Amino acid sequence: MQQSSSVGLCRSVISVLVATALYSPMISASTVDYGETVDGVVLVNDIQTVYGTTNNTKITATGEQHVKKYGVSNNTEINGGYQYIESEGEVNNSTLNDGYQIVQVEGAANQTTINNGVLQVYGAANEAVIKGGSLIVENGGIAVFAVIEKGGLLEIKDQGYAIAVNQKAGSAIKATTRAAEVEGVNSLGQFSIKDGVANNVLLENGGSLLVEENDFAYDTTVDNGGVLKVMDGGTAIGIDKKVGGVLTISTNVLEVSGKNSKGEFSIKNGESINYELDNGSMLIVQPQTKASYTIVDEYASMQNLGSDTGTTVMKYAVYNLGRADIDGQTQYSYDASSEGMKILGGQVNVWAGTMSNVTVSDAAGVLQIMTPLDNSAAPVLTGTTNVLNRASLYVHESADTINATVNLDYSNLVLFSASQISAYTQFMFSELNMRNSDVIMRDDFFSRTGVASGTEHYINLAVNTLAGSGNFYMRTDMANHQSDQLNVTGQATGDFKIFVTDTGASPAAGDSLTLVTTGGGDAVFTLGNNGGVVDIGTYEYTLLDNGNHSWSLAENRAQVTPSTTAVLNMAAAQPLVFDAELDTVRERLGSIKGINYDTAMWSSAINTRNNVTTDAGAAFEQTLTGLTLGIDSRFSREESSTIRGLFFGYSHSDVGFDRGGKGNIDSYTLGAYAGWEHQNGAYIDGVVKVDRFANTVHGKMSNGATAFGDYDSDGAGAHIEGGFRWGEDQWNIRPYLAFTGFTTDGQDYTLSNGMRADVGNTRILRAEAGTAVSYHMNLQNSIALEPWLKAAVRQEYADSNQVKVNDDGKFDNDVAGTHGVYQAGIRSSFTPTLSGHLSVSYGNGAGVESPWNTQAGVVWTF
């Protein structure tokens, strides 16, 4: 147990040399010679070497003082630098606020006050007062009459001495039973450590005691913040473990006994019986030892390399079977075992060995059967496992559960796959009994290297029998004919729901995929997804009872998925954007019939609502808001006049999908228009315009998840209108015929759920016939009003606006047919050069209802 003084001396010299090398680079140096006295020096970027005497020196963070043989330093203040007291050097009444005071062999520091920093002693420290920071007594060093106040720490290393210590309340002592001698007083009375025996030690506030092999500790008090660790072969008797203290022991101790907040405990002869670990305690059950009826309370931990029976693991406690971390090393035991455990809200991990007949309860309760180490025996779950009251059983790949009967009662079984060899991971249980519980199949979030699997690995769950009620959460890849599977080799009884993850990728047309097979029984399996359907690519799928004790996902072509309708909705909305913007220019052309002016600038704000249903099944509500700005000029001829103008505009559409989700279209438009009007009333107008559409899709799948995508597209169109305007007195009537054409370029894009969309050219090819009637009134102060009405019928001929979804969906997404439009408005001139207009319209037919289309604008002529 003792080390030679020569070894201690070598260690001291080496420590001093290393410290000097690390901390001594300075800019300048000064020396106080023998017989010389220096007072009041402040050391900044300076090394002071003292052979004589210094008084009232201040050492800054960049300063050092070396007190040599026969040198003396009095009343030194250390504020972050270093003071070295070498052999036969002496310092008195130092104040250590920060930094280091290092006393070498045969040096002495007397009456040092430590507020912060470290006093490191290889020689002697006499009457030190430790208010903060620490005093460290190294091998062969000695501290005499040290006073440890609240917040201070006295640490005694192996073969160190601390004599006549005064340990006050809230202070800390850190030591091992290999200290040469420690003795003094604490709040409990006299304490000591000598010859491998510790008596009446008080541990708190960062203090600790390590009881080494073949050593002893008697009547140790482990209070809040204190740590007592008893090594294999050590003995600790009469322990008083308080709340907040930490006790770490193993079943290989010779004997450990005492009391904690839960009562008396004892470990002896390789067996722990009725030990209740309280907050902060740790028990390590060593190989070929045993723990019986242990209670692992909140924030305590237990590691078992041997065997245990009847262990209870409380909430926030942690238990590991077959694995222990001892002195920084991880050890495994494949012979470890646990029988009859109760997990009441705690966490239990089975790394190796066998877990038998366990009960897990409470929402925080988790039993986790881990994946074995490479080429090692699998951890085993056997007997009956009861998982109750929202608790969870986690089983990782390659765990051995073939002889386990699992009873789930309002709880969860989660299976994790991460196979690097096969696309499928096999899980096998003897019996699975469920009551309102869930079985969840998923990829493993955990691996021993800390890296989760990067690809999907599917699970084949095989059980001999299945009974009860509950839910199975499974994954599918219909496009590649892969999925999680449930295989009941024997009888299956009860009522179960299968939940399948939605996806945007499509399988080949007509494909089905078997998810469940049983050997018989009256079990009923239905799809638990919303509405009893799951989105798989373009179409929805249902769970089909094949009639031979198997159930398969099968396509339902009568209903496309919400993601498909999202693609169709966005394609169908673009022509409506073009049309709403075109109406602002058409109204401008209609308002200037028979009016003389030179040049005008105009603006028109629009707000439009469209409720749309297409032949392909798209259904949405579009609300468009926009602004068009234009300029035109009128050129008079002998019997007619012409108009030429330019315009540009912006609009934003919010598109709400009937089956969930939404989209947005931002449109930027630019165009030109021209008109000719004869003095007899005949006229013809033409408009050409181009658009840039920025489209954003936020579709909703049936399970509520979002399918996101965005793409840009371009469009171009033209409109021509011809008619005749008759005027009599203040009345005007204007019948007309019009033709409109529009097309977009085709676009391909992919949604975030994997759905691929190929949107072809979306077109308008429309004829229109209508009549407008207006009445002009001149009021006072040059103000004029002109209310007007308009009615028209439109015939849409474009009937092959194709959209392809994945490889199995081809849709004609058009609104061909007859549509009626009814408008009313008023124009007003406020001054000879300023006028305004306001209009509203309603339209319906061919799958499009427009409850309103409002316009408001102003015109400035000059």
Language-model segments: residues:
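Outer membrane beta-barrel translocator domains of Type V secretion systems
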Residues: 557-733, 840-841, 846-853, 859
